[in-house]
Every structure is written in C-alpha cells, then in structure tokens.
C-alpha cells in the first residue's frame, strides 16, 4: 500500500534534511508539506523549493485556509505537484485557569469546517493551476465528496471523520468507484 508522509517544519534547512532522510523509504509514494499558517509567502516558497530539491517524489503542499488562494500559485511555481486545501481553521474559547478566564486556541475539526474549505477550494480551482487539487476539511459524507469534486478537486482527504468512523474512507472509496459524477 503506498504511503504519503506528512511533514511540517518552519526551517527550510531542517526540512531539507528530513526529506533527504525519508525520501528512499520503501513504499513511500509522496510527501505532503504542511505550511505554517502564521508564516509568510517568502517562507512558504522557500520551504516548498527546499523540499522539492531533495526528492523525486511528488510533493503535495497543504495550504492554510486563510492564505490558500494567495499562496497556491507560488507553491506550484516552487515545485508542488499538488495542493491540499486545506489546513483546519483556528478557533478559540475561554477556559477558567486559576480562577481567571484564559483563551485556548487550536484547530477546528468537524463537519462545519467543510463550508470554509469548499469556499477556498473554489477560489484555488479558479486559478486553473497545473497541479492536482486535493480537498481536505470537514468531509464526512458522500455528498460532501461529490461537492468537493464538483468544485475542482481530483481527490479528497478524510481527516477527523476517521477518528469517529475508522471505516469511512473505505466506504467513501467504494461509493466513489461505483458512482456517477454529481449532476448526471
């Protein structure tokens, strides 16, 4: 079974070293680079360039949702074979800590992330870049898979839904294999 390894690093030199170490792992079919959401375009471009310089494997770049449209073209120009739209959005809530409310921030997962992802997927698809588009975020149903494909994705990633229903990716793949495109 082919494996795509997800990597996340803020430092191009360290990322390059990691890519060089894992590049020849048997069964590894590709790499996915998660770009830092609090970084900038120059850093994103540098990370993609360094990673692609170290490998012959296809590199997918997972874009932060807020920057997806703005960074997509630069990622492809730097060597990305595919774009993953995208990373989970960030949220916050207030929790008591030693009698005082403090903010707790983190990634938001679940079906409600789908609409946010789909909006960015549509925007990136409109750029008509020469790469694969992979939808990721809030996909829990076959109908959502169809919507992502209709919006321009060639593939989907199932993230948090597998925590709740581990068999879901296989079920969706079977449905996909026997289905017709949305609208037919």
Per-region residue spans from a language model:
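Extended, intrinsically disordered, low-complexity segments
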Residues: 114, 170, 174-184
């Amino acid at each position: 079974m082919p494996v795509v390894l997800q990597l996340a690093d803020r430092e191009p030199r360290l990322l390059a070293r990691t890519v060089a170490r894992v590049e020849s792992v048997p069964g590894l079919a590709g790499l996915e680079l998660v770009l830092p959401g609090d970084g900038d375009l120059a850093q994103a471009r540098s990370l993609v360039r360094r990673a692609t310089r170290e490998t012959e494997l296809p590199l997918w770049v997972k874009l932060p949702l807020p920057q997806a449209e703005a960074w997509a073209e630069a990622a492809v120009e730097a060597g990305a074979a595919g774009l993953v739209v995208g990373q989970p959005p960030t949220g916050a809530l207030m929790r008591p800590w030693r009698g005082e409310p403090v903010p707790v921030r983190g990634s938001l997962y679940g079906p409600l992330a789908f609409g946010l992802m789909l909006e960015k997927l549509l925007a990136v698809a409109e750029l008509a870049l020469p790469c694969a588009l992979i939808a990721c975020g809030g996909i829990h149903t076959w109908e959502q898979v169809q919507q992502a494909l209709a919006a321009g994705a060639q593939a989907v990633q199932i993230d948090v839904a597998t925590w709740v229903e581990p068999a879901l990716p296989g079920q969706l793949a079977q449905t996909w294999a026997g289905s017709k495109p949305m609208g037919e």
